[in-house]
Design a protein with these regions (language model features):
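Catalytic cores of alpha/beta
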Residues: 175-191
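Short, well-ordered alpha-helical microsegments
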Residues: 81, 107-110, 177-181, 261-262
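Conserved alpha-helical substructure of the radical SAM core
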Residues: 1-121, 132, 136-140, 144, ...
Length: 283
């Protein structure tokens, strides 16, 4: 399913600034997981690691330029890189706030926990809290490891640094996990998660053939659901969003989800423009 959000054209002067607030830093496009919806699972995929030989100098330049924060990775898995904690420390030791996206599939060492506990924002890629389903969808990951890592980080943060990193749970929303969103939010709240993100699935059509040879059912965008299933999915999303806010957190629903749902509803003859923040718009 294609993301319906269109690109925005910028004039050159729009990019001029006297200060860079946040740097998006791609440490690697490699990943230790092979999620059943991700292009990394394709045999033709080739990732690449950043050359960290000059990382200290890069971090120093950022500090001198008054960069406030560095967002590390949004695609590959930083914590699979040897020495990743030291690379992150280069920014932290210079007063630059660090945010990271990780699948938390490794059991982290005390040194790694310490570095993570100093961060400002940690996004954990976790699509469901159903352990067996999580293994089927994301492969090579265990819910228990994720939860343990989170609590170890929170303990270190509050006991040594007198703060908590903000935890954001990110779910790539698919037909296989949408029914479990309520449990996903509840488990997150119980473990100190403050923010939840529903990610819009960008489908790779080749995956069905490649993974189908091994009997793997590839997740689909919820916009491909039938009428009854789609209506139920809409209510599941809205209920999870409400629960997140009632629990003191919030939820981001990425562009492409509502748009895909509304286009599908129109195909099914349901004249509704769903707004997940407004229950009266639900079918």
């Amino acid at each position: 399913m294609q993301n319906p959000v269109k690109s925005v054209a910028y004039e050159p002067e729009d990019l001029l600034t006297d200060r860079i607030e946040t740097v998006i830093f791609t440490a690697t496009t490699n990943c230790n997981l092979r999620c059943t919806y991700c292009g990394v699972s394709l045999p033709t995929y080739k990732g690449k690691d950043f050359d960290f030989s000059k990382i200290a100098g890069i971090a120093e330049q950022m500090a001198n330029a008054s960069v406030r924060a560095v967002q590390i990775n949004g695609h590959g898995e930083t914590t699979m890189l040897p020495g990743w904690a030291n690379y992150c420390r280069q920014f932290l030791d210079r007063g630059i706030k660090v945010a990271i996206t990780s699948n938390f599939s490794f059991l982290y060492s005390a040194e790694e926990v310490d570095v993570l506990s100093r961060m400002e924002w940690i996004t954990v890629s976790i699509d469901t809290v159903d352990r067996e389903l999580l293994k089927r969808v994301r492969r090579k990951v265990d819910l228990r490891t994720i939860i343990y890592n989170m609590q170890a980080i929170r303990l270190r943060a509050v006991s040594v640094y007198d703060h908590y990193p903000v935890f954001n749970w990110q779910c790539t929303l698919t037909d296989q996990v949408v029914d479990g969103l309520r449990d996903w939010v509840q488990m997150g709240i119980l473990n100190g998660v403050e923010h939840f993100t529903l990610g819009n699935l960008i489908e790779h059509t080749e995956l069905a053939e490649v993974l189908g040879k091994d009997g793997v059912t590839v997740p689909r965008h919820i916009a491909f659901l039938g009428k009854d299933e789609l209506v139920a999915a809409c209510h599941s999303i809205a209920d999870a969003r409400r629960l997140a806010y009632e629990g003191g957190g919030d939820m981001t629903i990425q562009p492409g989800i509502a748009e895909g749902v509304n286009a599908r509803l129109a195909q099914l003859g349901i004249n509704r423009m769903v707004d997940f923040s407004n229950p009266s718009t639900l079918p």
